[in-house]
């Protein structure tokens, strides 16, 4: 199966740039939703199409996508940079990576929880601010190690650079009742065990909230 890695940029055309507040709002959760809709313009081909691409916001109107189909050129975007994604890997290859992920796990009863939020619930409220990033590092590393067991790689090292909790757009009730999802920003190094299995999992994305720009792991040789 052919996979495409594309760099997509919002057009510099003044008529498009004038729509900046709509295409790329300043508030984070609203921006994630707007970008999801924006990128659909490059991939949808009808009302029955299901999302079959991953995406990552790089800031300043630039996005990376990983998809089974090449993105369609529209006036909203500048010329796409598209290439076939077929890295030449072997067992033992070391790769540097960066990943924006919504990391969850299943609890008893089948409910899924954000790994960092769940850990923070065990910490007294007045101590949570100080505990936030150490717990994000610990839980993010443990989660990605588990991902490696399924996706045929060994985690060599990882740094959690940031952790934020995003409120889903359109939920304006009491703050504690608003549905949220956590976003881990991770960079590090991994060792490939089985190239074919690794690339298969990478093309599917890691974690959840993929519609909101999570799950796309960018890699380069170490």
Question: Where are the language model's segments positioned?
Answer:
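RNA-interacting cores
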Residues: 1-222
